[in-house]
Amino acid sequence: MLRGGRRGQLGWHSWAAGPGSLLAWLILASAGAAPCPDACCPHGSSGLRCTRDGALDSLHHLPGAENLTELYIENQQHLQHLELRDLRGLGELRNLTIVKSGLRFVAPDAFHFTPRLSRLNLSFNALESLSWKTVQGLSLQELVLSGNPLHCSCALRWLQRWEEEGLGGVPEQKLQCHGQGPLAHMPNASCGVPTLKVQVPNASVDVGDDVLLRCQVEGRGLEQAGWILTELEQSATVMKSGGLPSLGLTLANVTSDLNRKNVTCWAENDVGRAEVSVQVNVSFPASVQLHTAVEMHHWCIPFSVDGQPAPSLRWLFNGSVLNETSFIFTEFLEPAANETVRHGCLRLNQPTHVNNGNYTLLAANPFGQASASIMAAFMDNPFEFNPEDPIPVSFSPVDTNSTSGDPVEKKDETPFGVSVAVGLAVFACLFLSTLLLVLNKCGRRNKFGINRPAVLAPEDGLAMSLHFMTLGGSSLSPTEGKGSGLQGHIIENPQYFSDACVHHIKRRDIVLKWELGEGAFGKVFLAECHNLLPEQDKMLVAVKALKEASESARQDFQREAELLTMLQHQHIVRFFGVCTEGRPLLMVFEYMRHGDLNRFLRSHGPDAKLLAGGEDVAPGPLGLGQLLAVASQVAAGMVYLAGLHFVHRDLATRNCLVGQGLVVKIGDFGMSRDIYSTDYYRVGGRTMLPIRWMPPESILYRKFTTESDVWSFGVVLWEIFTYGKQPWYQLSNTEAIDCITQGRELERPRACPPEVYAIMRGCWQREPQQRHSIKDVHARLQALAQAPPVYLDVLG
């Protein structure tokens, strides 16, 4: 509240009427208006200064509080208490200064609504103590308490510890206890947090049993104690009993989900908080699940096993014991936190038809066993006969000069050599006929209805930003790439395009189902395509429809189709062909059911529930092994592009797609610049640059090479290990440009081992020639994926 408001002036109550009045004050202040005559006046763009003597007795109902980042208060002797309600609306507050005032008490929860507070100055007030709870949860860079009549007691032990550890600038203040000497010399032998001991059953319990836990609390000045039951509601019926110093907890009718769940007892006193966690072992029989084999780096037969104790595993192949080798072996993925279920793969390195058959996984523990079987086919039999059958032998006619007097019998009327010659002649005729048909088809005037130009103009928002790299890379002059900051003049190379024959699909074979999204080029649909592959009558595909029918758009469409036809790799999204019958023109791609990698990472990260908005989320974050597998697959696709001398220019997780079995492929359908518009920085009219993924030479000189792609891949690695966060998310585009060009690097993500961060930093060398090659990066990631490092997130 305010004291001593004046009448007849633009006082506190008048400019508190609304944000428009506050804006007027800010404009006047910036224009050099006369000094503010009231108790609190605007300071800077988002600050407030309250310095008139005795004008405040609380901070309740500060005007424009929701936008304040700095609050300075001085000479307010009537301001004696700081409580929760005083700072309720100051969610953006960073700096708070209350000096030379009458402040005597700060409530333990006073700063609950100011989580961004980083600097707190309460010097020269009347504070005798300050609870550790007051600063709990704040990331304070500076805490100033000098000039207060502090009373030395165990309640200030936390502040003494800050002084010992050099936190918050406390050591420089050399705090004094009123009449008792320096705070650093305060005796603290008896100042300890509570001591906890939780009694758990010695033996494991069975599903359906009841478990009684007891928490014994010891220590001085006990204030509160209790149980943390967040993870337990679905695992048992919970009943609490007792109170300090002995707390009881009954878990009735326990389920197998209780395994690996933390049961935590906590207690607090004026010194601090203590917690002790225990786990209860619930025994249950083994269970197993097998899934269809998927092709990743190697082939993988995914499985999930559960049981307590952990079951032993054994594989059978066609009913016989499968002996594991370096080519066929069991690999477990990183276990999810607080779960007994283990996920893994039976890895098969380059399996052939010999490995086709029935695979059975047996799992057993002392309480039971389980098995599951699945048929796997990795390759068709290349032989037309059974290799185990005897090979037929043709006998030559018996020599008439034989000494034997037996009659001679000829096996065939037609000599074998004549049969071979006739067969070869027929084969040659068929081959030449087929070749002539293909040449005639590809040599005719193309089905796009346009003639190919010798030099192609800059593209405008193609689905995949993949470009042929001319000698030494490519760069954009200021007049180039008006349609997109990522495109330059692409010179057609006969080595890559002269023999390209784009597959044409009949429109009647495409049945659109529903719209997946829309980009600058047009719309993308989920469709059902018939007669696309010989082994399937119909299959789901993604269809991109061209919005414009202009000549330049059709040329871009043709060039993109030819380019995509040339790209055939297991980690590049597969392009099936085009449909040019009628309008609009269509491109047909492989359908990746899980969408783009960025959304997939966010929905499988630690913040998935926060981002889901009530929808179902994945059971837990991706583990280290899975993150490494994702990164290695993206690197494999980039190795392939680099081998063809293609520069991507827009490599990011938003431009990668995820399919069944955690298969990741490079490529998008041109929607990323619309869906992820905040990832691009607009330069001029239409140019959009992904500056947060670009190296200094690309930002400053528009130079794009395979080395600039390596830099971008390092940023993609950072995205993967932050579960899809935007690089430099805390900075504006211009601030991010400054950081990149000045040599600053993204910080190591919490989920990232040092070995992976070393790879990132190798990708971010300022000199392009000093960066790792993408081939070397891929090899290192593959090695880490096969043997993930042991990494503990001590902060998580």
Swiss-Prot record:
Stretches in topological domain Extracellular: 33-423
Impact when changing G522E: In CIPA; no effect on N-glycosylation, nor on subcellular location; reduced basal autophosphorylation and complete loss of NGF-induced autophosphorylation; loss of NGF-stimulated calcium flux
Residue ranges of the region described as Interaction with SQSTM1: 469-490
Cytoplasmic side, ranges: 440-796
Glycosylation sites: N67, N95, N121, N188, N202, N253, N262, N281, N318, N323, N338, N358, N401
Secretion signal, residue range per the UniProt entry: 1-32
Annotated ATP binding sites: L516, G517, E518, G519, A520, F521, G522, K523, V524, K544
Keyword annotations from UniProtKB, A to Z: ATP-binding, Cell membrane, Chromosomal rearrangement, Developmental protein, Differentiation, Disease variant, Disulfide bond, Endosome, Glycoprotein, Immunoglobulin domain, Kinase, Leucine-rich repeat, Membrane, Neurogenesis, Nucleotide-binding, Phosphoprotein, Proto-oncogene, Receptor, Repeat, Signal, Transferase, Transmembrane, Transmembrane helix, Tyrosine-protein kinase, Ubl conjugation
Protein's job: Receptor tyrosine kinase involved in the development and the maturation of the central and peripheral nervous systems through regulation of proliferation, differentiation and survival of sympathetic and nervous neurons. High affinity receptor for NGF which is its primary ligand. Can also bind and be activated by NTF3/neurotrophin-3. However, NTF3 only supports axonal extension through NTRK1 but has no effect on neuron survival. Upon dimeric NGF ligand-binding, undergoes homodimerization, autophosphorylation and activation.
Name recorded for this polypeptide: High affinity nerve growth factor receptor
Organism field: Homo sapiens (Human)
